[in-house]
């Protein structure tokens, strides 16, 4: 999975897909009442990137729908996976459930069109930066189920993104009954070098049949760093330069071992690489 990083403006969706991304990540900010309001990263962010792009959340979700709705003029066949980087650290722990509810309400209305009409082809990963906010998952799932559309949860996965100890992450999932659809991230801003020790631990847990189904690293922009991540067996690389990863995947060491995920692939199915 080539995961385009910090795609917070609608016009950037097409830009990153054109560069080769089959997945995009964006930052979701909440107000003091736990409502998701807009996509925005802010300063500081990755080196050599603009940090200030933003859209209202409802408008961004509508754009995601257009890009993953077969028959729509803006439909992008190979755009498959969306990573919602949920900036919940601005909230109290007690607000996590409400944040999940309100996130579900927005996605159900603006991306899934209230469960009506032609289904969209995108899959979602809810990426949470705080292990204490596990109730966000519960709030999200219970809200979708209450709307009579539990089948939509087949298209939703989860990630805790704070580089916590893997056993602690697994315990958080146990608290809300999650046993699959788990992506595990590992990383740091592209301005700083980070080793792959924890990423390799996550890969081992994936291959050992644990709760982790997929592993991705962020934010990786250099050719050699991408090669190192692929050698470690990750499923996805989040990058500011999808075209660089496209070129790396064409190299002899990787062209027969990896292929780009397509819209017929299940982003929650475990592969041992």
From Swiss-Prot:
GO molecular function, one term: toxin activity
Bridged cysteine pairs (disulfide): 45-51, 47-191
Keyword set, alphabetical order: Cytolysis, Dermonecrotic toxin, Disulfide bond, Hemolysis, Lipid degradation, Lipid metabolism, Lyase, Magnesium, Metal-binding, Secreted, Toxin
Superkingdom in the source lineage: Eukaryota
Family matches, as Gene3D superfamilies: Phosphatidylinositol (PI) phosphodiesterase
Pfam family, one: GDPD_2
GO cellular component: extracellular region
Protein name: Dermonecrotic toxin LarSicTox-alphaII1
Species the sequence originates in: Loxosceles arizonica
Record lineage: Eukaryota, Metazoa, Ecdysozoa, Arthropoda, Chelicerata
């Amino acid at each position: 999975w080539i995961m385009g990083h910090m795609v917070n403006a609608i016009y950037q969706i097409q830009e990153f897909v054109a560069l080769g991304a089959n997945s995009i990540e964006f930052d979701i900010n909440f107000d003091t009442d736990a409502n998701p309001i807009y996509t925005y990263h802010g300063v500081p962010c990755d080196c050599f990137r603009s940090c200030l792009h933003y859209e209202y959340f409802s408008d961004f979700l509508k754009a995601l729908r257009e890009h993953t709705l077969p028959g729509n003029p803006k439909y992008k066949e190979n755009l498959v996976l969306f990573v919602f980087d949920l900036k919940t650290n601005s909230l109290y722990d007690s607000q996590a459930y409400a944040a999940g509810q309100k996130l579900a309400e927005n996605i159900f209305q603006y991306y899934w069109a209230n469960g009506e009409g032609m289904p969209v082809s995108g899959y979602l990963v809810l990426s949470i930066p705080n292990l204490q906010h596990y109730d966000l998952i519960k709030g999200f799932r219970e809200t979708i189920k209450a709307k009579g559309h539990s089948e939509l949860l087949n298209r939703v996965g989860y990630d805790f993104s704070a580089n916590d100890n893997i056993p602690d992450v697994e315990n958080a999932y146990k608290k809300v009954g999650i046993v699959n659809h788990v992506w595990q991230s590992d990383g740091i801003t592209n301005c700083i070098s980070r080793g792959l020790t924890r990423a390799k631990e996550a890969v081992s847990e994936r291959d050992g049949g644990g709760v982790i189904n997929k592993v991705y690293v962020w934010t990786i922009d250099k050719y050699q760093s991408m090669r190192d991540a692929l050698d470690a067996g990750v499923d996805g690389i989040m990058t500011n330069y999808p075209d660089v990863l496209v070129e790396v995947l064409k190299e002899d060491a990787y062209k027969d071992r990896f292929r780009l995920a397509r819209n017929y692939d299940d982003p929650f199915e475990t592969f041992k690489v």
